[in-house]
Amino acid sequence: MKFLNEHIKNNTFKQVYLIYGEETYLVYQYRDRLKQAIIGDDTMNYSCYEGAKIDIKELLTTADTLPFFAERRLIVVQDSGFFKSSTEGLAEYIRSMPEYLHMIFIESEVDKRNRVYKAVSEKGYVSEMKYQPDSVLIRWVEGLVKAEGRTITRPAVQHLLDKTGVQMSNIRTEVEKLMCYTLDKPEITEADIDEICTTQIQNKIFDMITAISMKRQKEALDLYYDLLMLREPPMRILYLITRQFNMMLQVKELVLQRYDQAAIAKQLGIAGFLVNKYVNQSKHFAAEQIREALEYFAESETAVKTGRLDDKMAVELIIVKYSKK
């Protein structure tokens, strides 16, 4: 993204771009920013082709058409499949494309061995838009809120992300709902978030931990696959599982110290109704089992980061291990 921002800022563009990846919000944002920077509102010299049935001859004929009273012609090609299958003549064309021509390819997935991919890499610039880490998302949400003249604390932003997951389009929608809901309030609070924001991730994580604790393995795995379908990254799921087990351990220890529900809620900074849920989950594990699980989670994370274990498989193995009867 750094180089794309520089190209746009300095008005120094590559002739061809490939933007792809799982974070579609960023994919489309940079498509639109590049389009505006390269050609502005010129509709005469702009063409867009979309879908798997694009006529390559028609596309190249358009590409060979000189721009009308302008220096540039821009063609955007979306979801073509050109980067996963053989496309006659396109790679060669890209390598020798006319100077007036600019092309932006938008794809969800690519094969880096593909000839068209290699041609774009050599001639232009390729940018993969991955799901952003929490640190980036937190700053982004803070910026969105600040732009509206409001404030929000870091814990409140994290609480929002726990509900929404990492998809930026979903986060943006929920922030906009919050802005409307809290129209006269200077600060967005966790209570506001609980009141208005749609919970997609947190409830499924909670239900998954409950299924694990009750040894309902199929249910736990089904919930995990649901989270993957929501495009929640496996390592973030592991982070949330770890956090839930940490909370279970703290609740269990406070119960042993004879803290009541209200005192536990105050001590841990959580809602009272959550205490009972954590108590019920923790009943199915000894404190030492939870500590051992937390160590195993850390080992699994290290195995993924060092390339010894696939991230999806790592979380699946955790679920199977701790939901076994």
What are these regions (language model features)?
Residues M1-K325:
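Conserved beta/loop motifs at nucleotide-recognition and modification sites
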